[in-house]
A protein has these predicted regions:
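Charged phosphate-binding loop/patch that engages nucleotide di/tri-phosphates or the phosphate backbone
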Residues: 169-194
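Short charge-dense sequence patches
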Residues: 1, 32-42, 126-135
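Generic N-terminal amphipathic, Lys/Arg-enriched alpha-helix
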Residues: 1-11
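N-terminal strand-loop-strand
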Residues: 35-70
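Acidic, metal-coordinating catalytic segment for phosphate/diphosphate chemistry
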Residues: 9-46
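Unchanged
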Residues: 75-172
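Glycine-rich, flexible loop/turn motifs
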Residues: 30, 39, 71, 107, ...
């Protein structure tokens, strides 16, 4: 199954996901370039990383958003978006031993359409655009060594779930996305590694 099929089979958690699912399916169906960042609306992924106790999450201090944030990035043509999420996790934090929790079609944990304001990146202006974002849930060990990715973030740390809300300076992401992820997490059995 591809991402279109995964999103089509995904059961929305709330009204935001129902509305965003429609937008994502239209883009995935109608825009062959949506996996490339050249498209005005393009596929991205995030990975919400928690410890085995589901009490802590791993966050990075994102330079563009000037906020503590979840981890993620662009598909950049790669249609195996779960592998992109794990790659971004390793690139942005150094964490290499996370496991994705299979909690939905294609292991999707959440989906959202995110607005991105115009900004500077690597000395060039990037116009405002949309991220067609899918989120994966992963489990990692807080004892695994972490590191920053200096061109993207200036900090990496594990925080208590409720602290993820207070340390984010992005009101919409905090109130609409992080709260949703925390609420959904309470209903997910993350299992134990064997």
């Amino acid at each position: 199954m591809g991402l279109y099929d995964d999103v089509a089979a995904y059961v929305p958690f709330n009204e935001q996901e129902r509305a965003d699912k429609r937008v994502m399916l239209a883009a995935l169906r109608d825009d062959p370039d949506c996996f490339d960042r050249c498209a005005q609306a393009h596929v991205t992924c995030s990975i919400w990383v928690v410890d085995e106790s589901k009490q802590h999450t791993l966050m990075v201090y994102h330079k563009i958003y000037d906020s503590w944030s979840w981890i993620g990035g662009h598909a950049d043509g790669n249609r195996d978006v779960a592998s992109v999420a794990l790659r971004e996790l390793e690139e942005e934090t150094g964490v290499r031993h996370a496991r994705i929790v299979p909690c939905g079609p294609g292991s999707l944990f959440s989906l959202e359409v995110l607005t991105v304001d115009g900004h500077e990146k690597h000395g060039a202006y990037v116009s405002s655009h949309l991220h067609l974002n899918v989120t994966y849930l992963a489990v990692a060990d807080p004892c695994e060594e972490t590191r920053i990715k200096p061109d993207e973030n200036s900090g990496v740390r594990w925080v208590k779930l409720e602290e993820a809300l207070s340390c984010s300076s992005e009101p919409w992401i905090r109130d609409r996305i992080y709260r949703k992820l925390i609420e959904k997490l309470a209903h997910i059995d993350i299992g134990r590694e064997v």
